[in-house]
Design a protein with these regions (language model features):
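Catalytic loop of short-chain dehydrogenase/reductase
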Residues: 100-124, 129-138, 150-152
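Conserved glycine-rich Rossmann-like NAD(P)H-binding loop of the short-chain dehydrogenase/reductase
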Residues: 23-37
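A glycine/serine/threonine-rich, flexible loop-to-helix segment
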Residues: 150-163
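Hydrophobic structural elements of the Rossmann-like NAD(P)H-binding subdomain
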Residues: 66, 102, 143-146, 156
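Conserved NAD(P)H cofactor-binding loop of Rossmann-fold oxidoreductase domains
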Residues: 68-73
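Rossmann-fold cofactor-recognition segment
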Residues: 40-51
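N-terminal Rossmann NAD(P)H-binding glycine-rich loop of SDR-like oxidoreductase domains
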Residues: 9, 17
Length: 163
């Protein structure tokens, strides 16, 4: 199975990539940062997913996409978190071998807590996920989102310190 993970260089994305590699999958990672993974079954692209033209052509069909890339409390929250996920999904998801698309939304999408642009971007992801689920149904694929609360990653330092 070929897996695509955005935001694969740290936090949740890094750990998910490691897990898929441990299970023997081919993993393709997208991130603004360099990869910390050294594995022959891992292919890393240091790219900005909010720029459609930066997305590479990939040989073979992607079977699982984890839209995980996310910024918090920046002017780029909507462009990165929502538009970036849309760019990745629209380019790679609609193929005959797709099995599943998963979005890392946030509990903030429901509660409205935290930063305004972040909340809007994550709530938008939930709505977009529903749209993708309808369009993926003819492929026999699933589409879901997870809405985690606070996770101890470097991107949550500001929230955890309550500043």
């Amino acid at each position: 199975m070929k897996v695509l993970i955005s935001g694969s260089s740290s936090g949740i994305g890094l750990e998910v990539a490691k897990r898929f590699l441990k299970e023997g999958y081919m993993v393709i990672g997208f991130d603004l940062k360099e990869s910390k993974i050294d594995n022959p079954f891992y292919l890393h692209y240091q790219i900005d997913i909010k720029n459609k033209e930066d997305l590479p052509d990939i040989d073979g069909d992607i079977e699982f996409i984890f839209n995980n890339a996310g910024l918090q409390n920046s002017e780029d929250d909507i462009d990165n978190n929502l538009k970036g996920a849309i760019n990745v999904t629209e380019k790679y998801a609609f193929n005959k071998n797709i099995k599943s698309v998963l979005f890392n939304a946030s509990a903030s999408a429901r509660s409205g807590d935290e930063f305004p642009l972040y909340v809007a971007s994550k709530a938008g992801l939930v709505g977009y996920m529903k749209n993708v689920a309808i369009r993926l149904a003819p492929y026999g694929a699933t589409c879901n989102s997870i809405s985690l609360g606070g996770v101890l990653t470097s991107s949550n330092d500001e929230v955890i310190k309550d500043k």
